[in-house]
């Protein structure tokens, strides 16, 4: 790695995506506060990563995301590979990129945090998955072997959706039941739209259904 790459953080300050104008945020259902990175911005911010030998960001992450690895892929413009890597450890990375408390977890543990500003890990994670989905990327299940087993998951909140994702990847058919007509649980009904746009949840439903997950909504069990 060249000296310029190693010390890129000196020339590239921490920057978040642009905060959207108030008029745009309040139009309709209170849109998300921040816009999205464009590819050059995401690559620039991802390139600030020092690729630490002992990545504290990864250790501090509750699911131990391969953060330096997918930051490197973003810097190189390999977004679809980055999306696949994100999903190896996290069934809902686009949600975590928006609502996870990065300041107390991965970004708080970033080596650059105290003196130079942490790498914008959450915003880059959001960029990866949103961009990959927009480009038509979907989880590759071509090597999954059906087991013939079928599991019912009660509740279409974050835990239920994550469980369904992992079961399908293991070759197990899944039907998810929920008393409400929409999936998401707390993400749908507890987190306001200015933090998590509900269209993001709708996209995740489309992805899960494409993986073979069946939703039975408006059904109360027990």
Label each residue range with its predicted role:
Residues 10-35, 64-76, 85-87, 114, ...:
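Beta1-alpha1 glycine-rich phosphate/pyrophosphate-binding loop at the start
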Residues 1-150:
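Ferredoxin-type iron-sulfur electron-transfer modules and their immediate structural context
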